[in-house]
Amino acid sequence: MMKIRHKNKKPGKGSKGCKKPARQNGKKVTSRPSSAPQIVHGNDHASREAELKKKRVEEMREKQQVAREQERQRHRTMESYCQDVLKRQQEFEQKEEVLQELNMFPQLDDEATRKAYYKEFRKVVEYSDVILEVLDARDPLGCRCFQMEETVLRAEGNKKLVLVLNKIDLVPKEIVEKWLEYLLNELPTVAFKASTQHHQVKNLTRCKVPVDQASESLLKSRACFGAENLMRVLGNYCRLGEVRGHIRVGVVGLPNVGKSSLINSLKRSRACSVGAVPGVTKFMQEVYLDKFIRLLDAPGIVPGPNSEVGTILRNCIHVQKLADPVTPVETILQRCNLEEISSYYGVSGFQTTEHFLTAVAHRLGKKKKGGVYSQEQAAKAVLADWVSGKISFYTLPPPTHTLPTHLSAEIVKEMTEVFDIEDTEHANEDTMECLAVGESDELLGDMDPQEMEVRWLHSPLVKIADAIENRSTVYKIGNLTGYCTKPNRNQMGWPKRNVDHHCPQNNRVVEVSSVDRRPMLQRILETDPLQQGQALASALKNKKKLQKRSDKIATKLSDSMMSMLDLSGNSDDCAGD
C-alpha cells in the first residue's frame, strides 16, 4: 500500500522528477520540435526561371519601344506633323459630339451613369420601328427635343415618328385644338390622357364608349382616353406599311411627360414604374401589348445644360438637388398671374421675390437655425407645387408656323401617307369632344356591356321607418321594396344623378328594371379583333359582379321585409292583448 501511494504521488518542487523550465532573459523558453530540412523541388526552380525570362522580355520590349520613338522623332517631317495634328483634331471633335449628346441627361451627376442612359436611349431608337415622342400639352414646344428627332430620322431602317400630346386635361380645350393644328403641320399628332389610377395594378380604366357622350367631368376622373386613336394610328402603319410580323414602338420624351403612364394605359396594367420625380426609368423595358405590337420604354432625355431655368421648370431635374432654387421661382413670378399665386399661398403685398419667399416660408414654417426664415426651402416648396401641377399654367402656339431644319416637305408627306393623317384628325376631333365646356353630372366609368335603366317614379309609397330614420334612398326592384344607405354608382357603372337623400313628402321610388345579363355580343364584335377576347372576358367579369350585387341587394331587401313583418305581427299581438 505504501508503494502504491508513493507511486501515484506527484513529485515535490525539490525532487528530481520536477524540472524547472529553462528561462532566457526572464522569459520561459518552450522547446519546439526540430523542423525537417526544406526540400527544393524542380517545379519551383522552373517557375523562378520563367518569371525571370518574362521580366527580361518586358524590359526588351520597353527598350524597343523607346528606340522606335526616338527613330520616329528623328525622321519626322512637317507633313507628318500636320497629319498627326488633323488626326488628333478629328478625335477631339468626335469626343465633343459624344459629350453634347450626353448633355441630354444633365440631371445625372455621374458621367458613367449618363453614358449608360444614353446607351439605353440609342438602343430604343435602334430596335424600334415607330417612335412615340410624348409631349406635355402645357408646353409642347418646350418638351420637344429636336436633337432627338434628328437622331431618329437619320437612323437606319426608315424610322417613323409620331407626336403624342399628353395631359390635355390640364389645358383648356381651345388651347389644345390650337396646338393640334400647329403640330399636325409637321408630324402625326395624337391627343391623349393617361390613366391616373396609381393605386390600381390591373384593369386600368379606359374610355371605350363613344366620346361624344362624354363631358368635362370625364377629365376629372382617373380614366384614360385617346388610347383607341393611338392604337388606330399604329394599326394604320401595320396595314399601310405592309408589316408582316410584329412592330416595336419606342416611347421617348423628357422626364415626367407621361411615358410610363402612357404604356400602362395602353397595357391597362402597371407594367412600368411611374413617379413624379425624374430618373425613375433607368433601363430600356419591353412590354408586350399584343402579338403585333411591343412597346419599349426609354429613360427621359433632357436637352440643354443643367443650369437652364426652363429645364428646371419642366421637372427635368430633381428639385431637392438644385443649388439655386430662387432663380426659377423669380421666373415663375415674372410670367404668371400674381393674383392667383397670392390667393393660392395666402400672401399679398410683396414687391420682390425675396419678400414673397419670406412670406411663404412664414406660412409653411420653413426656418433655419436661429429662427431665420429659409428662402431656399420655401423656393423648393414652390417648385414642388409647380412641377406637381398644383399651380396651373399653359403656353400658346406661335402665330406663324415654320418647319424645323431637320424636317423637310418629303418627310412630312411620307408621314402623312403612312399614318393616314385625315383619320387621325377626325379621331382627335372626337377626343376633343370630351373637353366640352359645361356642367354635367354624368360620370363615365369603365366599359360596361350591360345596359341598366334607372327610372324615377312619382307614385306614392308607404313610408319605411328605417328609410326615414337613416335618410336613405328608397328603391323598388320588381315586387320588392327596400332601401340602400349609400349606393355605389361608380362601381356599378350607373350615371350619376342628383338624389335627394332626405325623404321628401312625395316619396320617390327608384325602379331598376330587369336587365339582360348576357354580354352584348354586337358591341364586342364592333371592337378591334385583337381586343375581342379581352372585351368578352371583361363582359363576363362584369356579369358576375352585377349578379353578386343583385343577390346581395335581394338578400338585404328580404331581410328588411321579414323584419317589418315581424314588427307588424308583434304590434298586432300587443293590440290583441
From Swiss-Prot:
Coiled-coil region list: 43-103
Region of interest called Disordered, as start-end residue ranges on this chain: 1-75
GO annotation, cellular component aspect: cytosol; nucleolus; nucleoplasm; telomerase holoenzyme complex
GO molecular function: GTP binding
Subcellular location field: Nucleus, Nucleolus
Region (Required for nucleolar localization): 9-28
Residue ranges, compositional bias (Basic and acidic residues): 42-75
TM regions (residue ranges): none
Domain of life: Eukaryota
Domain CP-type G, residue spans: 118-304
Basic residues biased stretches: 1-30
InterPro entries with a match to the protein in the record: G_CP_dom, GTP-bd, GTP-bd_ortho_bundle_sf, P-loop_NTPase, TRAFAC_YlqF/YawG_RiboMat
GO terms, biological process: negative regulation of protein sumoylation; negative regulation of protein ubiquitination; negative regulation of telomere maintenance via telomerase; positive regulation of protein localization to chromosome, telomeric region; positive regulation of protein-containing complex assembly; regulation of protein stability; ribosome biogenesis
Main location: nucleus
PROSITE patterns named among the record's database cross-references: G_CP (PS51721)
UniProt comment concerning the protein's domains: In contrast to other GTP-binding proteins, this family is characterized by a circular permutation of the GTPase motifs described by a G4-G1-G3 pattern.
Function recorded in the entry: Stabilizes TERF1 telomeric association by preventing TERF1 recruitment by PML. Stabilizes TERF1 protein by preventing its ubiquitination and hence proteasomal degradation. Does so by interfering with TERF1-binding to FBXO4 E3 ubiquitin-protein ligase. Required for cell proliferation. By stabilizing TRF1 protein during mitosis, promotes metaphase-to-anaphase transition. Stabilizes MDM2 protein by preventing its ubiquitination, and hence proteasomal degradation. By acting on MDM2, may affect TP53 activity. Required for normal processing of ribosomal pre-rRNA. Binds GTP.
Family, similarity comment: Belongs to the TRAFAC class YlqF/YawG GTPase family.
Subunit structure as annotated in this protein's UniProt entry: Interacts with MDM2; this interaction, which occurs in the nucleoplasm, stabilizes MDM2. Indirectly interacts with TP53, via MDM2-binding. Interacts with TERF1; this interaction probably occurs in the nucleoplasm and is increased during mitosis, when the nucleolus is disassembled. This binding may promote TERF1 homodimerization. Interacts with TERT.
PANTHER family from the UniProt entry: GTP-BINDING PROTEIN-RELATED, GUANINE NUCLEOTIDE-BINDING PROTEIN-LIKE 3-LIKE PROTEIN
Name of the protein described by the UniProt record: Guanine nucleotide-binding protein-like 3-like protein
Organism of this sequence: Mus musculus
The encoding gene: Gnl3l
